């Protein structure tokens, strides 16, 4: 008889829940709920379990915020809860709450070739460290290492490292953003809001007044080639994505590959392919040869957060991935 676990991927707006086959890792019965409609995460879980009538005693839910202890307070939502109390209330034997990019990193061993698009480099080296990052509402970062037949995710807040420009144009961007924001992290330029900041900085550096644009507006105008400033912003975004990925590769020697997740890049995939992304990735001066063979992949799986939550839980329960 198939045994299922509950898996989830929770952001600031929506909570996506599903069932995971503990033996195979297969994800099924996925459903998305609006977080605005429920007073707590536990309430959403109860609705899902009532709707599906499956006996579940184990769960793993990925959440877009730092997980540092039993108390979880979402940074982009009003939900806050005790993991131990929620586990007790639901009657679960196991309940894991993990960072969203921990989940994405744990999905990588489960991905198939059709879930990936490669951008340069050679083949990944088996057993070597892996980096994963992705731009969305913010900039998520994680690493993955293989130790004693187990995958270990190394979570952190790498998106908040300093923005490190490496060209005259990028230096001008930093100057403009520092005047507006004070501290300028990588996330301030590599995210949806970051694309807007890039556009604004480009326009303001030319002593002009920027329009009040949303990330979608900038992307659409760039792809239509109807706005030079928007196209420059999107081009710069791609190059800086490359530089940041190359930095991750250097930090941990990620010869197992660098993986890009998040919802932004797939929206302009052809533009990204033709951009200066790979050039930015390899632009490491004396260490260019070190990163040249490291492959970069774009994850095109529909929901790596659910897949990775399931993988994390299965490994916790003693399975080998």
UniProtKB/Swiss-Prot annotation:
Keyword Acetylation tagged: no
Disulfide bonds, paired cysteine numbers: none
Stored InterPro entries: ATPase_NBD (IPR043129), Bacterial_glucokinase (IPR050201), Glucokinase (IPR003836)
Location(s), subcellular: Cytoplasm
Keyword Signal belongs to the record: no
CDD domains: ASKHA_NBD_GLK
Main location as per UniProt: cytoplasm
Catalyzed chemical reaction(s): D-glucose + ATP = D-glucose 6-phosphate + ADP + H(+)
GO molecular function, one term: D-glucose binding
Binding of ATP, residues: 8-13
GO-annotated cellular components: cytosol
Enzyme class (EC, first level): transferase
Listed Pfam families: Glucokinase
Keywords assigned: ATP-binding, Cytoplasm, Glycolysis, Kinase, Nucleotide-binding, Transferase
Domain of life (superkingdom): Bacteria
Example of a GO biological process term: glycolytic process
Family in the record: Belongs to the bacterial glucokinase family.
Protein name (record): Glucokinase
Encoding gene per record: glk
